[in-house]
């Protein structure tokens, strides 16, 4: 009799707990690419959800008896919402499993042999559409989970369960936001891949041993065509940027107001040197405009370009585990640990004759990007691609506004952030020595911040170390011998006011790249506005194994905000992708009487907060206090 009384409640509780455990297992298994384990856990979770539903709806004498208690009587009606939420979670898991199992393998996979060219791959547009529909199905199930849990009267539940309901609601909302991004991405992807007409993209290959605003000098390019999901590198029209910039010819095109560097530097008026602004959309549009102008000037045909994708050698490192080892035209064994060094340095020593070196590197790069659509380990490709995008080693500009809107939403655009209600820092280095010494460059940015009322008084020091060991080959030294000549550009909020700038150590140049862009007026360096930001610039000259440093002192008005009973200081930091990530050190002096300080990620010593680490991603730092 007692077993009969206990059976109903036990099946209900056991079903709910088992569903949660198994669906968590399924999530972890799918994330790691373990599809068999994910399938088993999903089936178990679905069965457990059915068990919970059956137990909830079946007669249960013990539950009837427990209804005498007011606490149980109040809580039990809420269990219907919980059981509904569990069933919707299982439904979402089943649909997610279908995506995970079918996207990369089997008859429904996204990438398959091209029936018109058995040696090539094709992205199946109809399967992209089907996966997009499945994502929408998953999202609807997740939204139903949120709806059911939000309908629960948490106060009717035991206190021990309330936090779990709140966490589950937040998890559902977070998942819904992620699925919204995926839904938007799959909505534009068929068009981006040529499902409704041919698309051509300009793959801008940047050399980060010679820095430009977006991450490196644009020395090589590929035109990549997509037609109905079929990718093809247009090799005969790709290669050295000097196929476009014949004789480094400088061209005249209408320049936007924010193209300050290009307007002031004659050699920047061409496709391969127009990326001085760190804002990828601006630099990408200039690159396309100069490419078109160069084609017109030479009478050569040039296709309508639908977007520009910027990449640097770090992309090879991030994607190599998924792609597999490409041929390099050498016995040198390429791995994620050495491929960047090979491309930027060791290949120069292995092939000192420029023509042979370019041929070998071109062979490597062609093979690499062709393998993107026939990867050896597809499940390892996605996380590598995500990391390359988040670290700005890959940046995207698409010509169509609706597609670019999605890229911006995902923060894949490499654009200068608006950062409203926030202090702002972006240190951008340009190589004006015509060399490859940024391969040895180490940069440390140190901010000291003192808050005065609603304003921030900031001192930012930029220190560059030239780690080159002389002597080095001519192809590394370039035009300036062993002397490293980095142009430093500090981007601050548009209403920031410069108090003064000072050389802390070393030598600065007054006429490099030009006097207008480098010469100081007293203790004020050149200043310009760019995309809502104020920028101060100077150029250093640094011998091997030495460093140089410059400090900018400025005031940022109105940057401390009041939110409820807290004062809030927020700092938006953007980073320039480099071979060796810059280090950021921040010291913030708390106002007198500050209490209840909330400063995630900071360490505290007395009234000073400190934050220091290598900067590989754009980020936001925030401090809250009372008083």
Language-model-detected regions and their locations in the chain:
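A generic structural signal for well-ordered alpha-helical segments enriched in polar/charged residues
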Residues: 28, 47, 51, 289, ...
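Flexible, acidic/glycine-enriched loop-and-adjacent beta/alpha segments
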Residues: 58, 62-91, 98-100, 298-367, ...
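Non-catalytic accessory/assembly modules
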Residues: 8-217, 221-223, 358, 378-417
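A conserved hydrophobic secondary-structure block that centers on an alpha-helix together
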Residues: 33, 40, 270-314, 318
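Conserved beta-strand and immediately adjacent loop positions that scaffold enzyme active sites
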Residues: 220-222, 307, 487
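Lumenal/extracellular ectodomains and adaptor appendage modules
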Residues: 190-205, 210-216, 225, 231-285, ...
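Hydrophobic membrane-insertion alpha-helices, especially the h-region
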Residues: 1-5
């Amino acid at each position: 009799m007692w077993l009969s009384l206990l059976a109903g409640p036990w099946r209900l509780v056991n079903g709910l707990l088992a569903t949660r455990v198994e669906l968590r297992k399924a999530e972890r298994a799918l994330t790691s690419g373990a599809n068999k384990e994910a399938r088993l856990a999903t089936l178990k979770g679905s069965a457990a959800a059915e068990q919970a539903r059956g137990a909830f709806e079946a007669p249960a004498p013990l539950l009837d008896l427990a209804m005498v208690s007011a606490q149980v009587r109040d809580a039990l009606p809420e269990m219907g919402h919980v059981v509904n939420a569990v069933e919707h979670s299982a439904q979402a898991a089943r649909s997610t499993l279908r995506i995970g199992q079918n996207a990369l393998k089997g008859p429904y996979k996204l990438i398959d042999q091209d029936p018109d060219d058995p040696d090539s791959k094709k992205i199946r547009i109809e399967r992209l559409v089907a996966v997009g529909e499945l994502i929408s199905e998953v999202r609807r199930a997740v939204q139903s989970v949120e709806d059911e849990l939000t309908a629960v009267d948490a106060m009717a539940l035991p206190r021990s369960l309330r936090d779990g309901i709140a966490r589950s609601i937040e998890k559902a909302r977070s998942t819904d936001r992620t699925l919204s991004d995926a839904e938007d991405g799959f909505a534009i992807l068929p068009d981006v891949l040529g499902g409704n007409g041919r698309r051509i993209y300009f793959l801008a290959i940047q050399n980060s041993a010679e820095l430009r605003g977006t991450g490196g000098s644009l020395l090589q390019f590929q035109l990549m065509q997509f037609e109905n999901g079929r990718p093809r590198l247009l090799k005969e029209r790709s290669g050295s940027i000097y196929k476009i910039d014949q004789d480094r010819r400088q061209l005249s095109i209408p320049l936007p107001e924010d193209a300050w560097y290009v307007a002031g530097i004659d050699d920047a008026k061409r496709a391969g040197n127009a990326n001085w602004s760190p804002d990828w959309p601006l630099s990408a549009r200039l690159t396309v405009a100069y490419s078109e102008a160069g084609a017109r000037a030479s009478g050569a045909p040039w296709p309508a370009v639908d977007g520009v994708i910027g990449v640097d050698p770090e992309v090879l490192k991030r994607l190599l585990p998924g792609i597999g080892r490409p041929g390099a035209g050498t016995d040198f064994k390429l791995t994620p640990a050495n491929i960047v060094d090979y491309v930027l340095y060791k290949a120069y020593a292995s092939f000192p004759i420029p023509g042979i070196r370019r041929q070998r590197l071109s062979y490597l790069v062609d093979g690499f990007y062709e393998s993107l659509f026939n990867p050896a380990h597809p499940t390892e490709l996605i996380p590598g691609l995500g990391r390359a995008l988040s670290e700005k080693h890959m940046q995207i500009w698409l010509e169509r506004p609706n597609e670019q809107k999605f890229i911006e939403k995902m923060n894949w655009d490499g654009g200068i952030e608006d950062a409203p209600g926030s202090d702002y820092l972006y240190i951008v280095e340009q190589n004006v020595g015509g060399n490859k010494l940024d391969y040895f460059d180490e940069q440390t940015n140190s901010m000291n911040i003192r808050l005065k009322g609603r304003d921030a008084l900031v001192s930012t020091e930029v220190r560059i170390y030239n780690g080159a060991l002389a002597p080095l080959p001519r192809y590394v030294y370039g035009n300036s011998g062993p002397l490293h000549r980095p142009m430093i550009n500090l981007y601050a909020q548009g209403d920031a006011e410069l108090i003064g700038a000072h050389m802390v150590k070393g030598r600065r140049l007054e006429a490099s790249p030009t006097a207008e862009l480098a010469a100081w007026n007293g203790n004020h360096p050149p200043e310009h506005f760019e995309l809502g930001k104020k920028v101060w610039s100077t150029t250093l000259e640094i011998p091997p194994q030495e460093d140089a440093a410059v400090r900018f002192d400025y005031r940022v008005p109105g940057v401390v905000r009041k939110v409820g009973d807290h004062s809030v200081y927020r700092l938006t930091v953007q980073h320039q992708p480099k071979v060796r990530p810059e280090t950021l050190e921040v010291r913030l002096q708390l106002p007198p009487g500050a209490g209840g300080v909330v400063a995630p990620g900071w360490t505290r010593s007395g009234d000073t907060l400190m934050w220091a680490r290598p900067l590989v991603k754009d980020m936001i730092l925030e401090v809250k206090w009372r008083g």
